């Protein structure tokens, strides 16, 4: 089994699913996108379209966890500043795409959560693992936060707000709406800081704007 060919199939499927959605992406589309000779070659690597879709989702979250979420764990940087940098980086990614693709996890959730239990349960885990990392960050920042700040609820709120903001900006094809909601999210978090409100724009955000 050729690992490069397998990766080609996953890459083609990920691109097509992001552009069209899972339902409108056929095995034939993936075969053409990956440059395969036919269905026998596809089924040599994946037993079904469903199995391929699961692996695409798993691989996308692995990348997000190992690259996108690493800023939340940057040593030597205060936790709330790390959160601001993460938000700024997420906004920058979607601005670079003109807010046309959306989030692969949010897209699949909207498309399949009512129709496909296998995908629904996997996407639920994706959001839970993302929120868990944010919860750890808020727990680390607990001495900066007001006494009644709930790390778990703040983490879930951040995930829900960012996913909603990405969806709205995709519908409007307007990066400014994403930036505005991200700034409002930072202000909301700032309301939970003892005696001060952190800057809306972090070091990473200032660098992005330059």
Language-model region placement:
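Amphipathic alpha-helical packing segments from all-alpha helical-bundle domains
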Residues: 62-65, 69, 81-85, 116-142, ...
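Amphipathic alpha-helical segments used for helix-helix packing
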Residues: 82, 97-121
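Generic hydrophobic, amphipathic alpha-helix propensity
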Residues: 5-14, 30, 56-60, 64, ...
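Hydrophobic alpha-helical segments that form the core
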Residues: 106, 148-168, 184-188
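Amphipathic C-terminal alpha-helical segment
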Residues: 93-96, 159-176, 188-198
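Helix-turn-helix
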Residues: 8, 16-51, 55
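Short hydrophobic clusters on alpha-helical segments that form packing/core surfaces
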Residues: 9-17, 90, 162
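Hydrophobic alpha-helical connector segments
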Residues: 55, 69-101, 147-158, 205
């Amino acid at each position: 089994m050729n690992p490069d060919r397998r990766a080609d199939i996953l890459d083609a499927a990920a691109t097509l699913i992001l552009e069209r959605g899972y339902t409108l992406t056929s095995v034939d589309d993936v075969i053409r996108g990956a440059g395969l000779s036919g269905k026998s070659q596809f089924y040599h690597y994946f037993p079904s379209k469903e199995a391929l879709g699961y692996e695409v989702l798993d691989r996308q979250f692995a990348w997000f966890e190992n690259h996108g979420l690493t800023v939340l764990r940057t040593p030597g940087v205060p936790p709330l500043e790390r959160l601001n940098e993460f938000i700024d980086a997420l906004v920058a990614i979607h601005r670079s795409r003109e807010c046309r693709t959306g989030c692969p996890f949010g897209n699949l959730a909207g498309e399949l959560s009512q129709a496909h239990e296998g995908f629904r349960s996997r996407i639920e885990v994706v959001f839970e693992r993302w929120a868990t990392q944010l919860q750890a960050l808020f727990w680390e920042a607990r001495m900066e936060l007001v006494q009644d700040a709930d790390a778990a609820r703040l983490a879930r709120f951040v995930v829900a707000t960012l996913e909603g903001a990405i969806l709205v900006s995709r519908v409007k094809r307007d990066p400014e709406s994403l930036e505005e909601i991200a700034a409002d999210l930072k202000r909301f978090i700032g309301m939970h800081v003892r005696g001060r409100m952190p800057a809306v724009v972090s070091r990473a955000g200032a660098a992005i704007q330059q």
